[in-house]
Amino acid sequence: MQPWTKKNSLLRGTRFNTQLEPLEREMLGDSAVAVSDKLMERARTAPKDELAEMTGMASGHADAPKDPGLARLLPSFFREGDEEVDGDAALTRQLNETDIIKTKLMNLRFVVDYLGPNGSVNVSLTQDEVHPWLSAINDIRIYHSAQFDEFKKDLDVEGASDPVSYTHLRAHET
């Protein structure tokens, strides 16, 4: 990836430009789709609420996600040990999670649409496009970081602290 540059133009306004390698473009698009799929699955499995259907307000899950990546993308609204009124965390999550997922999906969709299946490796964003782009990239980073942490935990459980040696050992087992 080339470093980002800022270009000012009278006709096009301010633009932020970079050039991705083809593999980077493909991996970024695939990652955006993977995170979107997980978020959509979470939204689809939300319990149906009769009051929400009557009022038109979407209702989400009351419990935090079990998937570590989703748990980081959709964290609790209260910290462990903070004083809270019974049910506040669940109610807050239930009322806000769907909107948070919707915003994250729109940002990820922007990246996917921009890159497209045969999209350009040249990225040129307006000032208005920078925020959704960076939000989506950050969500992808957070999700994959949580997955990597789980992978490292699995390695420690199985006794291999070095991923390279673990992979090498697993290759010889088969």
Show which residues each predicted segment covers.
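A structural signal for well-ordered alpha-helices, especially hydrophobic packing surfaces
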Residues: S36, L108, V112-L115, G119, ...
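Aromatic-anchored, charged helix-turn/loop surface patch used as a conserved interaction hotspot
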Residues: A64-P117
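Conserved small/polar residues in nucleotide/adenosyl-binding loops
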Residues: T167-T174
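Short, glycine/acidic-rich hinge or "gate" loops at secondary-structure transitions
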Residues: T45, F151-V157
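Hydrophobic/aromatic-rich, well-ordered segments within soluble, folded domains that form packed cores
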Residues: S124-E150
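Short, extreme N-terminal leader segments that mark the start of a protein/domain
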Residues: M1-D49
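Non-transmembrane, amphipathic alpha-helical segments
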Residues: R12-M27, S31, A62, T92-T103, ...
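Gly-Asp-aromatic-enriched flexible segments
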Residues: L39-F78, D82
